Amino acid sequence: MKGRETMEQYQVTGMSCGACSARVEKAVSSVEGVTSCSVSLLTNSMGVEGTADSSVIIKAVEDAGYGAKKKGVQTQSNSADADLLKDRETPVLKKRLITSLCFLIPLMYLSMGHMMWNWPIPKILDGNHVAMGLIQLLFATIIMVINQKFFISGFKSLFHKAPNMDTLVALGSAASYGYSVYIIFAMTDAQMHQNMDAVMKYMHEFYFESAAMILTLITVGKMLEARSKGKTTDALKSLMKLAPKTAVVIRNEQEIEVGIEQVHQGDIFVVKPGENIPVDGIIIEGNSALNESALTGESIPVDKKEGDTVSAATLNTSGYLKCEATRVGEDTTLSQIIQMVSDAAATKAPIAKVADKVSGIFVPTVICIAIATMIIWLLVGQSFGFALARGISVLVISCPCALGLATPVAIMVGNGMGAKHGIMFKTAVSLEETGKTQIIALDKTGTITSGKPQVTDMVPVEGISEEELLSIAYALEKKSEHPLAHAILQKVEEAQIHDNLEIKNFLAIAGNGLSGKIDKETVYGGNQRFIEKYAKIPLSMIKKSEELANQGKTPLFFACDEQLIGIIAVADVIKEDSPQAVKELQNMGIRVVMLTGDNERTAKAIGKQAGVDHVIAGVLPEGKESVIRDLKEKGKVAMVGDGINDAPALTRADMGIAIGAGTDIAIDAADVVLMKSRLSDVPAAIRLSRATLKNIHENLFWAFIYNIIGIPLAAGAWYMLLGWKLNPMFGAAAMSLSSFCVVTNALRLNLFKMHDASKDQKIKNSVVLEEIQVQNITKQEEKTMKKTMKIEGMMCGHCEAAVKKALESLDGVEEAIVSHEEGTAVVSMTNEVSDDVLTQTVEDKDYKVTEIE
């Protein structure tokens, strides 16, 4: 967060299409002092960076014809801002649509059914043409009042010299309505003069149904578009729910429960087993294992002892902790993640709909053509009625029904297809843009892997069976709450072992392991360092543990009365479909990057098994968001994850894809949710997105071809040559046909097979990541160096322990693996340690170093 300009967030009202958001962004960007402005049509929000005063920014928005309000400062409760983000549009549009249909159906019956197919009508209207016209006028007027928002928005935008899709809808409907009103007066005049031929002629020139149909069909399109908008703005609210509301602090030597806002830096607070850490702090008394999955996304609890740091919203799984608050309020790690999500949501680039972009040119062009058509026909001597009819025909046939429905109808069908296969696209934008992905960043835990540790290997020493090893391990681990212990318990259940050994004097030592007594024998379980204190570990078993660790597995050692009995390896194994999913993504020309907070060795092992292109290990929550920023400079990025630590990265990415088994916040922050938690659904989602986008392009192509052919015909271009002229009624019919064709084409998506990889094609603009990624990986590789020392004089395990302890006490030495049998010490270092220092350290213990490699 440091080094960035302060961002102010605003709620914008009155936007209806991409042209609106573009106008707001342009207006605010021109304000002096604004360095960056980004408007999101999906969230109706605007993020502004710079020094400009908020009142000036709001005035700029209002001058552009829209409304703006500064969002409240983030507090414990953001109910006011959250209320602004609720989806109120869909219910309103649905109500408008249903009400409109109630009046449109009888209007269509009277205008089309009776006139064209002689359907029966009430006797009072039979032959009473003026009354028929007035009834149609009434129905059309009601529908126009119901959908008055189109007229308010459309004409308001026109007056601000920024016509949008609502403008075209309003003009087309108003022109049809106005012409029909004129026809009523003309018919009434003809009726008064007993000119029945004129009355019958006028009777067929009512276009009230066109005015009403235009509004109703566009309302359908608007509702479909509103339904496609997701709930990405719920992410902040979900994040805040993770923060504890209270804390237990020590004041006047008594434990008192207070509101979280009353905790100050330096306060002493206590956390009992099963409770969440209220604020960031440092442990001053006690030890425990903390489940940090809420922040790190890793499922394995981290052992904590005195002096270690703790973070808000992490879960204390075992011991009693007394901590000193170091960061409270907006300074906690959780609050920083919340702020990152907020900023990312506000600065996410707005994606204008294709139809809205085109309508910026299309609308004024059609208006000009309609006006020019009327003028030309008047100049060549035609009557005003003839010229007006040609102008109205242009407006009616150019109605953006097909243009407006091209995207939302395809989106609706695509969303339905995705839902059937457990792939939920939360917004229209997500369905359109997912297929354009060039880079996929995958979180490891729960995405590539199952997220649940499992026993993968059992390596008993000679003379011990796997069942005996598992029985002793079970006796120890069944009293532990550690997730790795759960893996062993699950393995015992699967193996159906019923040897119930009883453990006495059970002791859990934080950061090390477990101990207890079975009959008169003392048994131990834990990591290598812990077991080495109580039993000798053969070099062959050390090498085996190294081999297991290099495969991304965690080796657990078990000993009985100073004798090692074996190793049980536990790992978060990769999902069965992960390698195939990664391969399919690569076959599409997409670069696959794995991000994880794990150590480099584990990360590389998992990455190799999955077959990803690049691995970045040791990435913290803030780091993941930063990596996504860097990757976005190379191309369009999709992030796939499931933990809260992924939320900033999911929101920052061009497309956030959440695994269904993840936390609610990750799902809320994402654009796409994979309900079945299968990585193979990622390439399936990309295929569906590409197919949908192709369908949208086909729909738009049809809409344009229709207008290119229809507009000249409506304008009467062929009248002088062939005598062809288009009645506005047929223009309306053509408009309806164009919409039908668009919907029918969209329905073809139901036949699409999204899991079929046989027709996958590589993207044309594949990106190159080697430079940025190789530099990152090289730096990580340089962090760990190894040297092998040849040592003389070591005779037993005590000698090994002495040399090991001496070497590991050196600054920069991460680990020393010593063997008196081999006469070697393999030293792993994070910093360079000279040969002279290593030699002197060993020889100070009365051993001789003969060689260092």
Positions of predicted regions on the chain:
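Conserved ATP-binding TGD loop and adjacent catalytic N/P-domain core of P-type ATPases
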Residues: 2, 22, 35, 437, ...
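Transmembrane helix-loop-helix hairpins at the membrane interface
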Residues: 92-246, 357, 458, 723-728, ...
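ATP-driven catalytic headpiece of P-type ATPases
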Residues: 95, 314, 438-442, 448-481, ...
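Membrane-embedded alpha-helical bundles of multi-pass transporters
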Residues: 116-130, 159, 178, 417, ...
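Juxtamembrane coupling segments of multi-pass membrane pumps/enzymes
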Residues: 187, 196-198, 212-273, 304, ...
